[in-house]
Amino acid sequence: MSENEIKGILGTKLGMTQIFDEENRVIPVTVVEAGPCVVSQIRTVETDGYNAIQIAYGEIDPRKVNQPLTGHFKKAGVTPRRHVTEIRMDDVSGYEVGQDVTVEIFNDVKFVDVTGTSKGKGYAGAMKRHGFAGQGAGHGNQAAHRRVGGIGAAATPGRIFKGKRMAGRMGNDRVTTQNLKVQKIDADANLILIKGAIPGNRGGIVTVKTAVKGGAHA
């Protein structure tokens, strides 16, 4: 496995705090409890058409695992885990089924991409959901201060185009934040401190991978 190989791990967002760097500057960081995970399957070009490792994370009562997953974990020779994901990579020769994956894989990584589920906001208007400026605030506005305004549906085309930004359910989407700096790694506590904010609530499950736009090939 080369140094520039894409690496990834599952973890839990614990929350945000701040630390000080060598020049005594305050750095806002998100603390992620990353792993330990276990390799539950290896996919190769010969058998699956692509290279990837499947990693499993999180404790779960074996009685709560359905039959297909129970058989899958039994075949791999690992205890059942709550969360499973795949990490695609060019070379899987450095991994084997049953191998532990810890936060130490990021020791030589400077930047990461973090994928999680954003906070659900419920039904939101266009100003909050899309950042629209809104309309006039004066008395002449007939109760349309925060409305969308024109939506482009005149006689032609006679309909509203798909994807038109309007009010609706906001959040609870799969979101990836790219090129976040790895500020610190605590291998003993399975913690990775990432500069800035990452998607999701405290306690949410996130996937941390080497950055595709620089971190993995810097």
From Swiss-Prot:
**Keyword match Ribosomal protein:** yes
InterPro entries named among the record's database cross-references: Ribosomal_uL3 (IPR000597), Ribosomal_uL3_bac/org-type (IPR019927), Ribosomal_uL3_CS (IPR019926), Transl_B-barrel_sf (IPR009000)
Record keywords, A-Z: Ribonucleoprotein, Ribosomal protein, RNA-binding, rRNA-binding
Name a single GO cellular component.
cytosolic large ribosomal subunit
What Gene3D superfamilies has UniProt attached to this entry?
3.30.160.810, Translation factors (2.40.30.10)
Pfam families, per database record: Ribosomal_L3
**One record GO biological process:** translation
Q: Does the keyword Ribonucleoprotein apply?
A: yes
- Provide the GO MF annotations for this entry: rRNA binding; structural constituent of ribosome
Q: Kindly give the PANTHER family that the UniProt entry links to this protein.
A: 50S RIBOSOMAL PROTEIN L3, LARGE RIBOSOMAL SUBUNIT PROTEIN UL3C
Q: How does it assemble?
A: Part of the 50S ribosomal subunit. Forms a cluster with proteins L14 and L19.
Similarity comment text for this entry = Belongs to the universal ribosomal protein uL3 family.
The record describes the protein's role as: One of the primary rRNA binding proteins, it binds directly near the 3'-end of the 23S rRNA, where it nucleates assembly of the 50S subunit.
Q: Can you name this protein?
A: Large ribosomal subunit protein uL3
Q: Which organism is it from?
A: Corynebacterium efficiens (strain DSM 44549 / YS-314 / AJ 12310 / JCM 11189 / NBRC 100395)
